[in-house]
């Protein structure tokens, strides 16, 4: 379960921001997760509670905003939305797709006291 390691990284980012900006408590952590990132949101929610315990983020709500996968189709020269890798272009049916978005995971916003 790599979600545990991802949550440890998220808490590391939150704690670093707390040191830089001198806030005492995190109420909400908002993440942006791409549809092609291979991250299971349910598992991330579960792991976040465990990793956040006894940190500045203890009790914080984890909000997840899922972003779509996008790709450039070399066959029809269109930017298209895809749900998973290796599926055909929804516009022309071709398989010459280059992923352009949806692989990322980032801390989008923190609500703090």
Curated annotation (Swiss-Prot):
MF terms (GO), sorted A to Z: nickel cation binding; zinc ion binding
Highest taxon of source: Bacteria
InterPro entries linked: Hydgase_Ni_incorp_HypA/HybF_CS (IPR020538), HypA/HybF (IPR000688)
UniProt keywords, alphabetically: Metal-binding, Nickel, Zinc
Binding site for Zn(2+): 73, 76, 89, 92
One of the GO BP terms on file: protein modification process
Binding site for Ni(2+): 2
PROSITE patterns documented for this protein: HYPA
Function: Involved in the maturation of [NiFe] hydrogenases. Required for nickel insertion into the metal center of the hydrogenase.
Entry similarity comment: Belongs to the HypA/HybF family.
Protein name in the entry: Hydrogenase maturation factor HypA 2
Organism of this sequence: Bradyrhizobium diazoefficiens (strain JCM 10833 / BCRC 13528 / IAM 13628 / NBRC 14792 / USDA 110)
Gene label: hypA2
């Amino acid at each position: 379960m790599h979600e545990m390691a991802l949550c440890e990284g998220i808490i590391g980012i939150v704690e670093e921001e707390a040191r830089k900006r001198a806030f005492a408590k995190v109420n909400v952590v908002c993440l942006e997760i791409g549809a092609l990132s291979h991250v299971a949101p349910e598992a991330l929610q579960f792991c976040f509670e465990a990793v956040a315990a006894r940190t500045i983020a203890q009790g914080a709500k984890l909000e997840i905003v899922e972003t779509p996968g996008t790709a450039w189709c070399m066959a029809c020269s269109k930017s298209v939305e895809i749900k998973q890798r290796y599926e055909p272009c929804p516009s022309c049916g071709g398989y010459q797709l280059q992923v352009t978005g949806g692989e990322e995971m980032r801390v989008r916003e923190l609500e703090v006291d």
